[in-house]
Amino acid sequence: MSIGTIVQCIGAVVDIQFPRDAMPKVYDALVLQDSGEASFAEKGLSFEVQQQLGDGVVRTIALGSSDGLRRGMPVSNTGAPISVPVGHGTLGRIMDVLGRPIDEAGPIAADEKRAIHQKAPKFDELSPSVDLLETGIKVIDLVCPFAKGGKVGLFGGAGVGKTVNMMELINNIAKQHSGLSVFAGVGERTREGNDFYHEMKDSNVLDKVAMVFGQMNEPPGNRLRVALTGLTMAERFRDEGRDILFFVDNIYRYTLAGTEVSALLGRMPSAVGYQPTLAEEMGKLQERITSTKTGSITSIQAVYVPADDLTDPSPATTFLHLDSTVVLSRDIAALGIYPAVDPLDSTSRQLDPQIVGTEHYEVARRVQQTLQRYKELRDIIAILGMDELSPEDKLAVGRARKIQRFLSQPFHVAEVFTGSPGKYVPLKETIRGFKMLVDGECDHLPEQAFYMVGSIDEAFEKAKKLQ
C-alpha cells in the first residue's frame, strides 16, 4: 500500500503525489490518513483517481467535503476501485456513495463487497423482454406501457410532478411486485429522501428496498458516483436470478455532477457547457442497467428537463437509452389534470399490436387521434368559438375533453394533500373505459364526471350524483 501527499487542492479536485513506481491506477480509491495533527478535514475521506498527470501525480475527485484539507497531508492507495456492500444485508438500509450506513442503525451485515465500476453484460447474455408491467396508472398503461426489464424515463420541468409520479409507481409496483427494489437518490432534496423512507416504512415494504443517497448538498464526486453505487447493488440481486426494480431520482443531476467534475478537471466544455464525455458517461451507466438471462432490472428514472426544453443535450442523450418515455407537461398541469402526462408526446416501444394486442393498440391510437384533432381545432375555437365547428368536429372536441379529464387519476401518495383516496386501475378496466369513450358510449355524460376518477364505472356514478 503506497502513501502519497496532497500537492494541490481546488474545490473537490485534489492532486496527490505518489512515488513514481507506485502510482495509482485510474478509478483506484485513495484514503486520507490520520496525520495526528489538529484538522477539521473529514476522517477517512476517500478520493477517486480520475487522471494521471505524470511524475507520480494523480488528479482525484474527493468523495466528501474537501474542507480542511491542506498540502502535505498523507493519503494511502487502497489499490482497488471503490467497493460497496451488496446482497441481502443492504435491504432496509440507507447508505451513502461508499456504502456506509447513514440511518444510524448499526453496521451493514453484508458478506460481499463489489467494485462500483463494472463492465456491461456481453451481448450474448442479454435477454429481450416483451412482458408488460402493469402500473395501475391509466395514462401510462394506455399510451406508454412499461416492459418488464425495460428502461423508463419520466421527463418534466421543475414542479410538474416527476417525484410524485415516481412515488406512485413505487407504491403501485414495489408493493404489487413483491420483489426487491433499489432506490438511488442522485442530487435531489434530502426531504424527498426522508419522505420516501417513511413512505416505505409505513407500507411495510422497507425490508425489500435498499436505498442509496447522494443528495444535492453533497460534493459533485458523491453525486456522480451514487448512481453507480445503487446500480452495483441492483446488479448483484439480478445476478442471483431475481427481478429487480431500480429507481433513480434524478438522472439529470448525475449529468450535472459530471459537468461540475469535468470543469474542475480542466476539460473543454461542449454544447451548453456540458462535459465533452456526456454520451460516454450516460452510456456507461445505462448499458449496465439491463436484463440478462439470469435476472432482470426494470429501471424507472426521473429526468429533469431544464427550462422545459426536451432538445437540451442532457435529456436528449437520455432519450436514446429508454424503452418508454413519459413526458410530463406544464400545460396539462396548468389545467389541473394530474398526473400531467402528455399522451401525444409520451412514447413506448411496447405499444405494438404484437405485444399489447390489437384492441389495446387501436384504442390507444384512437385516443391519440381524438386528442390530436382537438389540439388542431383549439386555435379555431379560441378565435371563432365552438359554434363555427362542423357537427363532427364538435363531437370530437366533446370526446377529447372527456378523454383529457379521464386521463386524470387520484394517487395514493397524494391522498394527504388532495383528500381523495388513491385509485389503482387494472389494464383491462383502462382499455374498457377508453374504448367506451372513443365509441361514443359516454357522449351523454357531463365532462366533470370524468375528472379525478378511477374506472369508467366511477364516472357513471359521479354523473348520477351531478344530475
UniProtKB/Swiss-Prot annotation:
InterPro entries per UniProt: AAA+_ATPase (IPR003593), ATP-synt_VA_C (IPR055190), ATP_synth_F1_bsu (IPR005722), ATPase_a/bsu_AS (IPR020003), ATPase_alpha/beta_chains (IPR050053), ATPase_F1/V1/A1_a/bsu_N (IPR004100), ATPase_F1/V1/A1_a/bsu_N_sf (IPR036121), ATPase_F1/V1/A1_a/bsu_nucl-bd (IPR000194)
Annotated transmembrane regions: none
Membrane-related topology note: Peripheral membrane protein
Keyword ATP-binding belongs to the record: yes
Key words, A-Z: ATP synthesis, ATP-binding, Cell inner membrane, Cell membrane, CF(1), Hydrogen ion transport, Ion transport, Membrane, Nucleotide-binding, Translocase, Transport
Protein location: Cell inner membrane
GO molecular function: ATP binding; ATP hydrolysis activity; proton-transporting ATP synthase activity, rotational mechanism
Cellular component, GO, one term: plasma membrane
Enzyme class label: translocase
Catalytic activity: ATP + H2O + 4 H(+)(in) = ADP + phosphate + 5 H(+)(out)
NCBIfam families to which the protein is assigned, alphabetical: atpD
SUBUNIT field: F-type ATPases have 2 components, CF(1) - the catalytic core - and CF(0) - the membrane proton channel. CF(1) has five subunits: alpha(3), beta(3), gamma(1), delta(1), epsilon(1). CF(0) has three main subunits: a(1), b(2) and c(9-12). The alpha and beta chains form an alternating ring which encloses part of the gamma chain. CF(1) is attached to CF(0) by a central stalk formed by the gamma and epsilon chains, while a peripheral stalk is formed by the delta and b chains.
The protein's role, per its UniProt record: Produces ATP from ADP in the presence of a proton gradient across the membrane. The catalytic sites are hosted primarily by the beta subunits.
Family statement drawn from the similarity comment of this UniProt entry: Belongs to the ATPase alpha/beta chains family.
Protein name in UniProt: ATP synthase subunit beta
Organism: Ralstonia nicotianae (strain ATCC BAA-1114 / GMI1000) (Ralstonia solanacearum)
The organism's taxonomic lineage, starting at the top: Bacteria, Pseudomonadati, Pseudomonadota, Betaproteobacteria, Burkholderiales
